[in-house]
């Protein structure tokens, strides 16, 4: 199972390495080389719980054992969402609605950002990396709070969220500024979301900065 950079197919990583690195050195995304070849039997998933579906999908993309995948899913969602089905499908008179607001921050981003920290923690163990992971990310709203809440107090991870001081709502700003967790930080910047994003990308290609962090047993990810 190999992941390749979208900007350089010669850059190849295994799934755990791709999870930990985030972006490739030249700014590309890591994509599964055989994406589309692995088939998922959707009929077998009918009637399955969210947890069972999540585990079935993850088996196609990560190099974890079944036990590790099950643990990731359990720790990501159990007791953290207000509905036992996580994303329940609600029937209306003329259709259906998939509810994506049952997470800890009421944002749809909770679905993915509750799982990512567990994947990160497990990947660190798989590759036997002794460094802690520092997540740097920019937000214009919901992503920041969801990421902070997801990574809150997850072992061997730290997260810092940058947001435009005048570019988020009062509610979103308050959510981030009052975030709990020993490993969470937020920082407002002068500028817009693109400025925050560009600043983070510059840090990721700053070899001296990354070298200094590694001297403190910290590795960047996004």
Question: Can you annotate each of these PLM segments?
Answer:
Residues 1-222:
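PLP-dependent amino-acid enzyme catalytic core
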């Amino acid at each position: 199972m190999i992941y390749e950079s979208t900007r350089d197919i010669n850059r190849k990583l295994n799934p755990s390495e791709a999870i930990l690195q985030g972006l490739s050195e030249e700014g590309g995304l890591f994509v599964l080389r055989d994406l589309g070849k692995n088939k998922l039997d959707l009929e077998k998933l009918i009637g399955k719980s969210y947890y069972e579906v999540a585990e079935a999908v993850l088996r196609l993309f990560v190099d974890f054992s079944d036990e590790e995948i099950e643990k990731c899913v359990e720790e990501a969602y159990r007791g953290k969402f207000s509905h036992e089905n996580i994303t329940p499908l609600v029937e209306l008179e003329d259709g259906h609605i998939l509810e994506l607001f049952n997470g800890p921050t009421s944002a749809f981003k909770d679905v993915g950002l509750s799982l990512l920290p567990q994947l990160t923690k497990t990947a660190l163990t798989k590759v036997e990396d002794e460094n802690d992971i520092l997540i740097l990310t920019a937000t214009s709203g919901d992503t920041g709070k969801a990421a902070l809440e997801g990574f809150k107090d997850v072992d061997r991870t730290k997260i810092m969220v940058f947001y435009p001081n005048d570019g988020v709502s009062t509610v979103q700003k308050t959510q981030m500024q009052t975030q709990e967790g020993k490993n969470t930080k937020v920082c407002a910047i002068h500028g817009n979301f693109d400025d925050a994003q560009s600043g983070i990308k510059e840090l990721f290609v700053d070899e001296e900065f990354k070298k200094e962090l590694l001297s403190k047993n910290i590795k960047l990810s996004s």
